[in-house]
A protein has these predicted regions:
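Well-ordered, non-transmembrane segments within structured domains
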Residues: 81, 85, 97-104
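Short helix-capping and inter-helix turn/linker motifs at the boundaries of alpha-helical repeat units
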Residues: 1-5, 55-56, 98-99, 134-136
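Solvent-exposed, charged amphipathic helical/linker segments at domain boundaries
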Residues: 90-98
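The feature marks the first
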Residues: 1-50
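Amphipathic regulatory helices of Ca2+-sensor modules
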Residues: 25-45, 76-91, 121-135, 157-171
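Primarily EF-hand calcium-binding motifs
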Residues: 7-22, 51-73, 101-119, 140-158
């Protein structure tokens, strides 16, 4: 991958977190994502699912800030994101799964999850809606959600969502 491709990928990853477009990632971005999901799926913030989503958003923010907020100002700039989050997540993709899992689990529950064999799943359509609400273009959301249904049964397991999100945010550096 060349440097221009790397920069494009980083910009997309950063924009996915920067929900309000103010050029930095902060707690408000994670809360905004939670609020959008709750509104889209008609879930009240004070119910168990709503509280779990906000708790997951806070855990996600704390994890992101812990690995990327170098100056401690409770904001992650693009430079901090590239130098901190992207590098650390590339070095340890499992770390991303750890910090993202509570939010993703709660998001799946809000999207209308069902339990199958002890795992949480959501329909492909629900995951597609969630991706659109979080800022993905319609065609990208459709393709991404469809690709997560690996067995073709119309549902997507939590583990598949976590793995896919971790893979998406693990950006390989450009060729030297």
């Amino acid at each position: 991958m060349d440097s221009a491709e790397y920069e494009r990928k980083i910009a997309h990853r950063f924009a996915a977190f920067d929900q309000d477009g103010n050029d930095y990632i902060d707690r408000a971005d994670f809360n905004a994502a939670a609020a959008r999901l709750l509104t889209e799926f008609g879930t009240k913030a004070r119910c168990d699912k709503g509280q779990a989503l906000y708790t997951g958003a806070e855990a996600f923010w704390q994890g992101m800030a812990g690995i990327a907020d170098v100056d401690g100002d409770q904001r992650v700039t693009r430079e901090e994101f590239v130098g901190g989050a992207v590098k650390r997540l590339r070095d340890n993709p499992g770390r991303f799964a750890e910090i993202a899992r509570p939010f993703l689990r709660a998001a799946i529950a809000v999207a209308g999850s069902t339990e199958t064999d002890g795992s949480t799943v959501a329909t492909v359509a629900a995951v597609e809606r969630a991706l659109r609400v979080l800022g993905a273009e319609e065609d990208v959301a459709s393709t991404a959600a469809g690709s997560l249904d690996t067995d073709g049964d119309g549902t997507i397991a939590e583990a598949d969502v976590v793995a896919a999100v971790a893979a998406y945010f693990t950006v390989i550096e450009p060729d030297a």
